[in-house]
UniProtKB/Swiss-Prot annotation:
The main replicative DNA helicase, it participates in initiation and elongation during chromosome replication. Travels ahead of the DNA replisome, separating dsDNA into templates for DNA synthesis. A processive ATP-dependent 5'-3' DNA helicase it has DNA-dependent ATPase activity. It comes from the Bacteria. It comes from Rickettsia prowazekii (strain Madrid E). Residues 190-482 form the SF4 helicase domain. Homohexamer. This is Replicative DNA helicase DnaB. The keyword DNA-binding applies. The gene is dnaB. The lineage of its organism: Bacteria, Pseudomonadati, Pseudomonadota, Alphaproteobacteria, Rickettsiales. One of its GO terms (cellular component) is cytosol. Signal peptide: none annotated. ATP binds at G221, R222, P223, S224, M225, G226, K227, T228. It catalyses: Couples ATP hydrolysis with the unwinding of duplex DNA at the replication fork by translocating in the 5'-3' direction. This creates two antiparallel DNA single strands (ssDNA). The leading ssDNA polymer is the template for DNA polymerase III holoenzyme which synthesizes a continuous strand; ATP + H2O = ADP + phosphate + H(+).
Amino acid sequence: MVRNKINNDDNLSIPRVLPSNIQAEQMLLGAIITNNALLSYVSEFLRNEHFFEPIHQKIYDAIEKIIEKGLIATPITLRSMLTQDALFKEIEGEGYLAKLITMSMMVINPIDYGKIIYDLAIKRNLINIGEEVVNNAYNSSLAVAAKEQIEYAEAKLYDLTKEGLNEKSFTKVGISISESLASINRAMKNNDHVIGISTGLLDLDNKLFGFHNSDLIILAGRPSMGKTAFAINLALNTCNNMRLKNIRDNQEIKSVGFFSLEMSSEQLTTRLLSLCAEIDSTALRTGMLSEDKYNRLRKEANTLSELQFFIDDTPALSISAIRTRARRMKRKHNLGILFIDYLQLIRGVSKSENRVNEISEITQGLKAIAKELNIPVIALSQLSRAVELREDKKPMLSDLRESGTIEQDADIVMFIYREEYYLTRKEPVAGDAKHAEWLDKLNKVYNIADIIIAKHRNGPVGNVSLYYDSQFSKFGNLEKRTFNSI
């Protein structure tokens, strides 16, 4: 649809010039040439591409390279580096450098000029992003959803805000010690000494001390071991434990985010209801419920509805889309912990043909999300089929698919293993002498799931045995067969 143009001189299109400040660029360059020490004050945030004038980009780049070599950037050394450059010749570079030095005599605070140059560069980038977004919207095919374009634009804008002027730098050790002591004091006041987000499982908390902010935790296992079920239990427990802690400390309630790339949100919530109401999920799917069970179901459904638990079941998300959505949830719902089911279903951004490189990009992206949003990120992962070829089916770090990069980027790697699953498939013939021995082994591992902590960057590794009720996919403390109530 074409709108009628308003015939008004005030509304005529006026050519617009990209924002820049050539004089600020000249004065800063002259000041640095006069006093090379000034480069260290601006080089942390200012790069050569932030300059508007191409010749200024080349001069700044040459200054950096000369100083990096341990030399002094002067008109003489700069001329020797740029003498073959066509643009430098065109503007009679030697005289231009002298002009820059003359202009620097008026500079009072060169850092301010650097910030002006940087700010104007960001505005130009903002204009470029805006034009790109508009052009993409006009030219995109029906195959590209508007939502994808919005996420792309949001990611571009967010990346722009993270560029350059970053206030976080070196921290004096005294400040870090104060923060560490505060954390230790909080742990001393907790009877359970859990300093992170409690998993709701005592023995697991004793090993991990809870889930910690900025940690990437990998939960891996073979199919039918209960990875998703365990993740749902952990998500529910952490959601409830964060809520109780936030209420106690009079803080804004934190939320749980769950990216379900394999199951639909309906399937996931059916599992949640089965877990909480202790009703078999088959009965929930078929609707074969007694009045008593239905009333129990309604009660648990009302309780779950009040929790800050958010599910995103969009399939085949890219690591970039996950980052964008997690940032949005942090802003809107105070995201406290993030679960992703599962890692191998995430798409990389670079679309590398090498799957190992793509997984590396994904795991590094997940770790970056954990650090940036200051939350624990729990990502589920598959294990290779090599496990099934061994007599001993207990997983090892080498069983992780594309294991090198996953193991390297993760702060914690946990495996879920249920010996009961394998034993039930090896039942000898009834009455056979080996049957009694098999039955004895089965009784020892019945309803038990082992959580093998194979890597723990800041704590002990080892095995934690949990009680597992396969009927309701419910995990609890083994010793007393107890569960974290919600």
